UniProtKB/Swiss-Prot annotation:
It holds the Pfam family IspD. The keyword Transferase applies. Catalyzes the formation of 4-diphosphocytidyl-2-C-methyl-D-erythritol from CTP and 2-C-methyl-D-erythritol 4-phosphate (MEP). This is 2-C-methyl-D-erythritol 4-phosphate cytidylyltransferase. It comes from the Bacteria. The record marks 24, 31 as: Transition state stabilizer. GO terms for molecular function: 2-C-methyl-D-erythritol 4-phosphate cytidylyltransferase activity. Pathway: Isoprenoid biosynthesis; isopentenyl diphosphate biosynthesis via DXP pathway; isopentenyl diphosphate from 1-deoxy-D-xylulose 5-phosphate: step 2/6. Keywords: Isoprene biosynthesis, Nucleotidyltransferase, Transferase. The keyword Nucleotidyltransferase applies. GO terms for biological process: isopentenyl diphosphate biosynthetic process, methylerythritol 4-phosphate pathway. Its EC number is 2.7.7.60.
Length: 236
């Protein structure tokens, strides 16, 4: 359907980097292929976007292209599955080059976050129509300590100013492309896409998300996700 920005209908592309090995899960299967209540994690993640009327296309950067195509290539709005890279940043860049060339908004979302709610997705996409960089985030609940290499606390940041960043992270396409090109030129490797955009001086805004939008990293995360899905099913 696209969204309205500046009086124009702007197509929305979603990039899902899915080339991770999931080493922290143990075993030989990448976490995006592991079952979660009877369905692979990646299937659940892709469905969250394919069912969103604001999304026009989904591009996936995969470690195993053929296995990924067999799993989700038939799903609505999946237009391309490209080879991912050694780092997450490499995978996002590969997918970014594969999106359609029309002016658009690009949302980048972790393959291992299958619990994104429809309300948060719709809200952050609509917010991005008016601002070139939006990231889903939640306020931190724990006290955070900055610790030096010797294990001694250096500082205690003001918790009221700290947010835990999730995905999707949503950008105007030209801004994201410029940020990636600058990072490549500088040899910079960021921990998320927003850090690249911050480096080129574009303000990044937070859109309040939901704590249940977990990134599945450990077996404990999977158990918690199963409980959240059970609760979601009871509410339907």
């Amino acid at each position: 359907m696209s969204i309205h920005a500046g009086g124009l209908q702007v197509p929305v592309s979603v990039i899902i980097p899915a080339a991770g090995s999931g080493r922290r899960m143990g075993g030989g299967t990448a976490k995006q292929f592991l079952p979660l209540r009877g369905e692979p994690v990646l299937v659940r993640t892709v469905r969250r976007f394919s069912e969103c009327p604001l999304v026009d296309e989904i591009v996936i950067a995969a470690g195993d292209v053929e296995a990924t195509r067999a799993l989700v290539g038939h799903m609505p709005k999946v237009t391309r599955i490209v080879q991912g890279g050694a780092e997450r940043q490499d995978s996002v860049w590969a997918a970014l080059q594969a999106v359609h060339s029309r002016p658009r908004i690009v949302a980048v979302h972790d393959a291992a976050r299958p619990l994104l709610t429809a309300d948060v997705l719709k809200g952050v996409l609509q917010a991005a129509a008016d601002h070139p960089a939006q990231v889903v985030a939640v306020p931190v609940q724990d006290t955070i300590k900055q610790v030096g290499p010797d294990g001694v606390v250096v500082a205690t940041p003001d918790r009221s100013m700290l947010w835990a960043v999730q995905t999707p992270q949503v950008f105007w396409a030209d801004v994201l492309v410029r940020a990636f090109r600058q990072a490549i030129a500088d040899g910079f490797l960021g921990t998320d896409d927003a850090s690249l955009v911050e480096r080129i001086g574009v303000p990044v805004r937070v859109y309040r998300g939901h704590p249940g939008n977990l990134k599945l990293t450990t077996p404990t995360d999977f158990r918690l996700a199963e409980l959240l899905l059970e609760e979601e099913a009871r509410q339907c």
